[in-house]
Swiss-Prot record:
Residue positions binding substrate: H112
Catalytic activity: xylitol + NAD(+) = D-xylose + NADH + H(+); xylitol + NADP(+) = D-xylose + NADPH + H(+)
Example GO biological process: D-xylose catabolic process
UniProt similarity note: Belongs to the aldo/keto reductase family.
Active site: Y50 (proton donor)
Biological role stated in the UniProt entry: Reduces D-xylose into xylitol. Preferentially utilizes NADPH as a cosubstrate.
Effect of substituting K272R: Increases cofactor specificity for NADH over NADPH 50 times
Enzyme class: oxidoreductase
The species this protein was found in: Candida boidinii
A Gene Ontology molecular function term of the record: D-xylose reductase (NADPH) activity
Binding site for NADP(+): 167-168, 216-225, 272-282
This protein's name: NADPH-dependent D-xylose reductase
Length: 321
């Protein structure tokens, strides 16, 4: 079983269904990645900030060594964290990523957020998360996004990265970046679920030839274990009457409806699971179609509910306002 492929604006192929590495426990990560490759996953969406790239690399390299897959058949993703936006820091970041993954290159490198924090040396704290080197004090770095992007373009030219992309960007920032870039973003990764559809942003990205990957496809479910305050105020999508009724009509689990709603509209998805049967089930989401009426019913659930918002991190960062 394998995922359908999407053709990026640089001609490279990207699996439409991948495995998201966010919150995958370090203790079981390598084994989980290995098992995911065994059942057919080829795209692994990771990040510096996830703190598990060494384990992801262990799983990937074991699968390659055991002959389950060739490196060129995989699509490995990482993301540049906020503390590494200075051009010199971008080079340090990719070296760290490749070292942790034990790979010579990655297939896609996102700018994780359009936020430049103060640089924190790797040996001091890694991943730094929201630490800026001075207790709880938040410090920005005076580095424009285009400056960071040009340093990322150099990674492509040097063969360390095949494609570069953007994550958590709004339309105006994308437009500004396109005015000055040499290499256009190949992919935009955004929070996307029925409570936060962002149709105009998706339409704009598509008109610019930028593929869209959805994260947190299950909405509040992704944030339950983080004790996110907004989770308490909304119905889980797995139990929402609209989703469950559509799932019953197709005799599939609610999760499959949520993922198919995205892929049927051309988006890529990156769900995760530690259970083999769910891993396989998530790969098979394109074996049925939702009706136009069902697609519209799901989209009608949109209430603009964003869970991953830097403004709520305690530092009033104006990413989405």
């Amino acid at each position: 079983m394998s995922s359908p492929l999407l053709t990026l604006n640089n001609g490279l192929k990207m699996p439409q269904i991948g495995f998201g590495c966010w919150k995958v426990d370090n203790a079981t990560c390598a084994e989980t990645i290995y098992e995911a490759i065994k059942v057919g996953y080829r795209l692994f969406d990771g990040a510096m900030d996830y703190g598990n790239e060494k384990e992801v690399g262990e799983g990937v390299n074991k699968a390659i060594k055991d002959g389950l897959v060739k490196r060129e058949e995989l699509f490995i993703v990482s993301k540049l964290w906020n503390n590494f936006h200075h051009p010199d820091s971008v080079k340090l970041a990719i070296k760290k990523v490749l070292s942790d993954l034990n790979l010579e290159y990655i297939d896609l490198f996102y700018m994780h957020f359009p936020i430049a924090q103060k640089f924190v040396p790797i040996e001091k704290k890694y991943p730094p998360n929201f630490y800026c080197g001075d207790g709880d004090k938040w410090s920005f770095e005076d580095v424009p996004l285009l400056t960071t992007w040009r340093a990322m373009e150099e990674l492509v030219e040097e063969g360390l990265v095949k494609s570069i992309g953007i994550s958590n960007f709004v339309g105006a920032l994308i437009q500004d970046l396109l005015r000055g870039c040499k290499i256009r973003p190949a992919v935009l990764e955004i929070e996307h679920h029925p409570y936060l559809v962002q149709p105009r942003l998706i339409e704009y990205a598509k008109t610019e030839g930028i593929h869209v990957t959805a994260y947190s496809s299950f909405g509040p479910q992704s944030f339950v274990e983080l004790d996110h305050p907004k989770v308490k105020d909304c119905t889980t999508l797995f139990k929402h009457e609209t989703i469950t009724s559509i799932a019953s009509a197709h005799d599939v689990p609610p999760a499959k409806v949520l993922l198919r709603w995205a892929t049927q509209r051309g988006l890529a998805v990156i769900p995760k699971s530690n259970k083999k049967e769910r891993l396989l089930g998530n790969l098979k989401i394109n074996d049925f179609d939702l009706t136009e009426a069902e697609l519209e019913k799901i989209e009608a659930l949109d209430i603009g509910l964003r869970f991953n918002d830097p403004w709520t991190w305690g530092y009033n960062i104006p990413t989405f306002i």
